[in-house]
A protein has these predicted regions:
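A generic structural motif
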Residues: 69-71, 96
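A cytosolic small-molecule/anion-sensing beta-strand core signal
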Residues: 62-63, 80, 99
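Short acidic-glycine-tyrosine-enriched beta hairpin
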Residues: 73-90
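Glycine- and acidic-residue-biased ligand/ion/polar-headgroup-sensing regions
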Residues: 54-67
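Conserved short histidine dyad/triad with adjacent acidic residue
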Residues: 36-53
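A short, N-terminal "cap"/entry segment at the start of jelly-roll beta-barrel domains
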Residues: 1-35, 49, 116, 121-128
Length: 128
């Protein structure tokens, strides 16, 4: 059994802070679950270009407001507490936060822990 608390994550290699988001990575590839799970905070009044070409992601908003824009279609979806979106087609998108958004994110394949978005908006596969 795996049991972790936020205090166990803060200030470790599983606490990744960037200009537009901070991610507390609770479950990673090394945990052997077949997916990774994170509590990610999207910083207020930010826009992040993302393209998970190597991963599938499901995201559940537990706090805050924003939107996701799918680049290829121009579709824009409102995000607020209680919203789930799943990037099941490797969609290129913009994630915008009107207020600080707290998100529970699940990735498959799992992340290893220190990934940040590359210039094309993606995370590398483990071992790349």
């Amino acid at each position: 059994m795996i049991v972790k608390k936020l205090d166990d994550i803060i200030g470790t290699d599983s606490d990744v802070d960037t200009k537009t988001w901070r991610s507390y990575r609770f479950l990673l590839k090394k945990d052997g679950m077949g997916f990774s799970m994170h509590h990610t905070i999207i910083k207020e009044n930010t826009e992040t270009y993302i393209w998970y070409k190597n991963h599938l992601e499901a995201v559940y908003c537990i706090q805050g407001e924003g939107e996701i824009e799918v680049i290829d279609t121009g579709d824009v979806y409102s995000i607020q507490q209680g919203t789930l979106y799943a990037l099941n087609g490797h969609e290129k998108h913009y994630l915008r936060a009107r207020s600080e958004m707290h998100m529970v994110c699940v990735f498959n394949p799992p992340l290893t822990g220190r990934e940040i978005h590359s210039a094309d908006g993606s995370y590398p596969l483990a071992g790349e």
